[in-house]
Structures are given as structure tokens and as C-alpha cells.
Amino acid sequence: MRHRKSGRQLNRNSSHRQAMFRNMAGSLVRHEIIKTTLPKAKELRRVVEPLITLAKTDSVANRRLAFARTRDNEIVAKLFNELGPRFASRAGGYTRILKCGFRAGDNAPMAYIELVDRSEKAEAAAE
């Protein structure tokens, strides 16, 4: 029985899923918007939002926790130097999911996941 088990399996084993979301979280922090399938976007939200909340309080311990979850110093630096201060006054809800149709090959529902207060630089790069 799968009672009270949260999270989606996404037809992957645990280590594959963990690595995939670690990479996707890094891409979202780096580019501030990514395109993926809707279920992956909904699950990625559960990974990225706690990272941004962690980045709102800058400490060595929090930086080490963020590094343990992302394994990328560049991402940790952006989280704590840019995103933490940017979202300091916002109590959660740092990401937005926008549905964008269906993929041509397999008709999978696609979505953009983005950070809500994207910088103008990131918006120009996305277009």
C-alpha cells in the first residue's frame, strides 16, 4: 500500500530522481525559468522553495546545507547573494508554474517553472 507516501515516482528509481531534481534545481536557480513536464515542475517546486527559504538567512551552516542539496558552489553563491535578499520580504511562493501546451512526440503536458520576481536580465535572456 502507498498510504501517506508523498511525492511522485516519475518512473525513476530514488537516486535517479534525486540527481534529476538536483540538476533541475540548479538550472532553475541559474536561468530563473526552465521548461519541463508539468509533473516534474510540480515536484521541482518542492525542492526549490525550501532552498530559497534557507538562503534568506545567510550563515555557514545554511550554505553547507544548500551545498549538500545542490553540490554546486555557483548555485549556492547565487542563492545566498541574489535570491535570498530578493525574496527576504516574501513568505513562500517563490515559484510560478505556467502551462504551455503539450509536447509533440508523446503529448506530455509541458510547463514553464519560473521564479516570481525574475530580474530584467534573466527575462531578456529568456526571450
UniProtKB/Swiss-Prot annotation:
From which residue to which does any coiled coil extend? none
UniProt keyword list: Ribonucleoprotein, Ribosomal protein
Signal peptide range equals none
Q: Which InterPro entries match?
A: Ribosomal_bL17, Ribosomal_bL17_CS, Ribosomal_bL17_sf
Record GO terms (molecular function): structural constituent of ribosome
Q: What are the annotated GO cellular component locations?
A: cytoplasm; cytosol; cytosolic large ribosomal subunit
Q: Which GO biological-process labels does this protein carry?
A: cytoplasmic translation; ribosomal large subunit assembly
Q: Which domain of life is it from?
A: Bacteria
Q: Which Pfam families match?
A: Ribosomal_L17
Q: What does this protein do?
A: Requires L15 for assembly into the 50S subunit.
Assembly and interaction partners: Part of the 50S ribosomal subunit. Contacts protein L32.
Q: Which family does it belong to?
A: Belongs to the bacterial ribosomal protein bL17 family.
Q: Know the name of this protein? A: Large ribosomal subunit protein bL17
